[in-house]
Amino acid sequence: VCWLLDPILFPGLRRTEIVEPVFVIGHGRSGTTHLHDLLYRDQERFSCFMMWELFWPSLLPKKLIRGFGRLDARWFGGLFERRARARSDARYSKTRDAHHQAADYPEEDDGILTYSCASGSWSLRVPDLSIVSVHYLDEWPERRRRRLMRFYRECIRRQLYLNGPEKTHLSKNPTFTGRVESLIEYFPDARFVLPYRNPLETIPSLLALMRGFWTLRGVDEETMQRGFAQLYEQSIHSYTYPEDVLARHQDILVSRIDYRSLVTRPRATVEKLYADFGYEVAPSLRAVLEEAETRVGHHETKHQYSLESYGLSETQIRERLAPLFARFGWASSPDEDSATTPSFG
């Protein structure tokens, strides 16, 4: 009902255009979140979804909740906001080491598709990825795919109306590596950011993350192993499919980011991205990037992952992704990788 009321209560919604949206896509654990965290701070330019907003596809509830937030700040000194934030911290604090989450923090906007069974979060609930097949959306039956993409486009339109129609939608979703063709079809002036990280690091890291989630849900080892095999094939697809699609669409602007550069030179990396898209770096964002430079090297991962524990080997990954290994010069050791940070267009 609220969805149908939106264009009636907010006539300007029909005139809101989605212009040159930016999609940050890439294999999970490849720096998509870190990059998105930097970009969304350019709030004069970008619009994105906060986590709590993903529960409300319609514009009307968001308007009401934001209005209540202003009343809370004015009349109750932010009492209800503090309580909501405390509940959010209690719920998500245990998993923030793997992925930062909070109700008032930007989140992967495929969450708006959860009730349509098209969000990557379903892989946490259903280890047999063939049941929901959220990754391979470009291969869905045409009618179902088009219905979902129309819905997603209208969700973005509502969010832009809410945050400012003049802004650019910013999306970060690793699962979108399997729906690049659909994104170009429904957003023909879209721009893509592709972070790349050594798959010898990202693949076992992703599998370890999923093992943690599935263990909490009581999934048995045999079912997990089947899920790992499906995730491995999905991982290979995540590295190869976007480039295959973009090669057919030479007019689409793409910025490719090397993870090693992102973590060692965040300012130069974001400046390169902005140059690729013809953006100017605002003073407020420049200050954010300067702060990011001061934190370089302060966070070192404590995790070590083994390919063998998932029935994989370095040789088979190198064979499947040989062109990318040649292009990026990825080493066998993460320490060796960190010593070389090539830049490219």
Per-range role (PLM):
Residues 1, 13, 132-150, 160-163, ...:
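PAPS-dependent sulfotransferases, especially Golgi type II membrane carbohydrate sulfotransferases
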Residues 1-20:
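Extreme N-terminal, non-catalytic leader segments
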Residues 24-44:
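Glycine-rich phosphate-binding P-loop
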Residues 25-27, 170-174, 196, 259:
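Short His-Asn-centered micro-motif
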Residues 42-52:
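Post-Walker A helix-loop "phosphate-sensing" segment adjacent to the P-loop in P-loop NTPases
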Residues 55-169:
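PAPS-dependent sulfation machinery
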Residues 161, 165-189:
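Flexible, glycine/threonine-enriched loop-and-boundary segments that flank and lead into catalytic domains
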Residues 183-208:
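Conserved phosphate-donor/acceptor-positioning beta-strand/loop module used by diverse small-molecule
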